[in-house]
Amino acid sequence: MVKLLLAGLLGLSCGLIHKASGDQGIEGTVFSVGGNRMPAPNRKPSAPKEGVRATICIYELTNISQVDRVGDAPYYQSIHTRMIRQADTDDKGHFKMLLPVGQYSIFTKKGDLFYASRRDEKNNLAPIEVLSGKMTKVKCSVESDHKPVY
């Protein structure tokens, strides 16, 4: 009887732990960025209009010193931290990934290259933080092959 009671309590506690951490991660949209993005006194920069299909790659928090960069561009040939998860967006660029609590770097993949243009004050690339029980909202971008970005 005691064994049955302990087994029931153990199962209940595991279920509660699983449920509490089950709906956390990141969600967002990937946009294609092109055209005049420079601010001016009488003009707002053009905003991305529609999301695009893309591959999203989540890595352990990655510093600029842990990647092989392509020149001075925000493209990277290889990333020397562990990949946590990879997923494709839908046709409108939307994605949602469940992740454990922690800090990560988010990249979009373009061919064999990874793209991330944002850095924090410690030179970590495209940092995101997943908090317990929360979905972190993310906006990602990819550069267009056909439109200049300035």
Where in this protein do the model-derived segments appear?
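Sec-dependent signal peptide recognition
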Residues: 1-7
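Primarily secretory-pathway and cell-envelope proteins
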Residues: 14-71, 110-150
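Short, acidic Ser/Thr/Gly-rich low-complexity loop/linker segments typical of extracellular
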Residues: 66-92
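Beta-strand-rich interaction surfaces with strong enrichment in secreted/lumenal proteins
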Residues: 84-87, 95, 125-129
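Short, surface-exposed beta-strand/beta-hairpin micro-motifs centered on an aromatic residue
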Residues: 91-99
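A short tyrosine-centered beta-strand micro-motif
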Residues: 100-108
